[in-house]
């Protein structure tokens, strides 16, 4: 895992198309702004897991 130290307003890039900016820090919370092409889906981990579980359940129901 890459660990970075950034100040508010600073950015880092992921590949050529994704930029992440530190918008703010409040206690234990960090606000991030993510710029990515519309065809790249960006989700929080818990939302991504829910989507993956739902798709898995749908696939299981459609199998003969």
UniProtKB/Swiss-Prot annotation:
Origin: domain of life: Bacteria
Gene3D superfamilies: Translational regulator CsrA
GO BP: any one term: positive regulation of translational initiation
Keywords for this protein: Activator, Cytoplasm, Repressor, RNA-binding, Translation regulation
Localisation per UniProt entry: Cytoplasm
Single GO molecular function: mRNA 5'-UTR binding
Assigned GO CC terms: cytosol
SUPFAM superfamilies referenced in this protein's UniProt entry, alphabetically: CsrA-like (SSF117130)
InterPro entries: CsrA, CsrA_sf
Similarity-based family: Belongs to the CsrA/RsmA family.
PANTHER family per the UniProt record, alphabetical: CARBON STORAGE REGULATOR
Quaternary organization: Homodimer; the beta-strands of each monomer intercalate to form a hydrophobic core, while the alpha-helices form wings that extend away from the core.
Stated role: A key translational regulator that binds mRNA to regulate translation initiation and/or mRNA stability. Mediates global changes in gene expression, shifting from rapid growth to stress survival by linking envelope stress, the stringent response and the catabolite repression systems. Usually binds in the 5'-UTR; binding at or near the Shine-Dalgarno sequence prevents ribosome-binding, repressing translation, binding elsewhere in the 5'-UTR can activate translation and/or stabilize the mRNA. Its function is antagonized by small RNA(s).
This protein's name: Translational regulator CsrA 1
Source organism of the structure: Pseudomonas syringae pv. tomato (strain ATCC BAA-871 / DC3000)
